[in-house]
Each structure stands twice: as C-alpha cells, then as structure tokens.
C-alpha cells in the first residue's frame, strides 16, 4: 500500500491491487497546490471548500460522501457518521469517517469535531493506519486527537489538518500532538510504501506535497 500526503486532509492511497483512492480534495483558496489527479475513488468527509473540491479531477471516478458500506473495484469502504463539532452537527454539520479495508485497514477521520463514541469505534473495527486531524479550531485539538488515537489504537498514526507555512487560516501546530508520543518518525518525503506494520505504535510525520 502506498500513501501520499498531498496536503491538509488530502491523501492519495494506492492499494496493493492498484486502486487509487483520494481523500478530501481541497480548492486553491486553502493555500496549497491543487493537483490534477485521476483517482478511481474519491472520499469526501463533508462539503466544505477544503475537503470536497472535485473540480480539478480527471477521468471517471466513484464519489463516496455518505455513511454506509461500499465496495469499489474490490476495495471495501465503510462510511461512519460523526460530527464536525461537539454539538451534534448544530454548528458545522456532519462529518464522515471512512475506513478503507485492503491489506491494511486505513481510517481517515475527516474534520472530526469530537472524541469518538463507543458505537462509532465499534463500527470502525480494527484500524492499522489512522489519518487524524490534530490542529483544533474546526476539529479535535491535539489533546483530543491523542485521546482518539489511544481509543482507536492503530499501529501507524499519520497527523493531518494542522498549521503550515502555506495554509491560509489558523490551526494548531502538529508538535502539540506529537509531544504526547515517544516513537515519532519525521520523514523527508510526502510518500510512503507500507508493506509491514511496526511491532509498536508509531507516529509518522509526512511532508506535504502541495
């Protein structure tokens, strides 16, 4: 499995069989480079400009933007309803957590605004790789993200949705999240290929491509 961190909450995930899955594409108002991609599947956690922009995408793709269980090109995908805030969606609406089931199970939390409830964790099932927002303001903050990561208990944690030099609005820094962990690998690349899981939990901090 290959995972490329484009920027913000957007990743391009390529499964062992070659299926390309794009998560939460953003528009150019965010500050990052917008890429012209040709994915097979696009997952959007909600409709905001920084998570649901599909205008630059090419070719035919399957869009998944709701809760439920889906199978696309042999890849199983679960969408689990959560909220973008701590007020059951009254402030910012719903958010979909996606779990991609392939050789490894990858969970993308979108703009999760609250700590996960027991029934949501049960629906997610076993997660190997967790893509988690950590910057607060519009999502869970660093401490809440630590609590969520502890509850999900994956082998690999990849932070997303935090302040960078290019981002045009304020979020918390990723260091506020990583300081809670002992095993942190800072990578000088936006792309990783995962063939095996580490024996112990590890935070992997990727560079963003955009």
Feature map (PLM): residue ranges:
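Conserved beta-strand hairpin/beta-sheet module of binuclear metal-dependent hydrolase folds
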Residues: 1-30, 91-110, 129
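Active-site metal-binding loops of divalent metal-dependent hydrolases
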Residues: 25-27, 46-47, 82-84, 110-114, ...
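Binuclear metal-ion centers of metallo-dependent hydrolases, dominated by the metallo-beta-lactamase
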Residues: 4-6, 91, 156-210
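Active-site metal-binding motif and surrounding structural segment of the metallo-beta-lactamase
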Residues: 27-69, 122-131
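Active-site-proximal loop/helix segments of hydrolase catalytic cores
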Residues: 86-152
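Active-site environment of divalent metal-dependent phosphoester hydrolases
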Residues: 28-31, 47-52, 114-117, 137-141, ...
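Portal/gating segments that form or line small-molecule/metal binding sites
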Residues: 54-107
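Divalent metal-coordination and catalytic microenvironments
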Residues: 13, 42, 77, 111, ...
């Amino acid at each position: 499995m290959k995972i490329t961190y484009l920027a913000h909450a957007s990743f391009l995930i390529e499964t062992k069989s070659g299926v390309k899955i794009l998560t939460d594409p953003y528009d150019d108002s965010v500050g990052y480079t917008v890429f012209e991609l040709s994915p097979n599947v696009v997952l959007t956690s909600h409709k905001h400009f920084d998570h649901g922009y599909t205008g630059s995408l090419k070719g035919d793709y399957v869009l998944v933007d709701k809760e439920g269980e889906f199978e696309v090109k042999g890849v199983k995908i679960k969408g689990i309803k959560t909220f973008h805030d701590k007020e059951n969606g009254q402030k910012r609406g719903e958010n979909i957590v996606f779990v991609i089931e392939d050789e490894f199970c990858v969970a993308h939390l979108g703009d999760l605004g609250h700590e996960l409830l027991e029934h949501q964790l049960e629906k997610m099932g076993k997660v190997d790789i967790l893509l988690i927002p950590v910057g607060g303001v519009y999502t869970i903050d660093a401490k809440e993200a630590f609590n969520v990561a502890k509850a999900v208990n994956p082998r690999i944690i990849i932070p997303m949705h935090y302040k960078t030099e290019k981002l045009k609005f304020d979020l918390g820094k990723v260091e506020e999240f990583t300081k809670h962990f002992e095993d942190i690998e800072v990578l000088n690349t936006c792309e990783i290929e995962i063939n095996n899981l580490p024996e112990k939990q590890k935070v992997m901090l990727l560079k963003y491509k955009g």
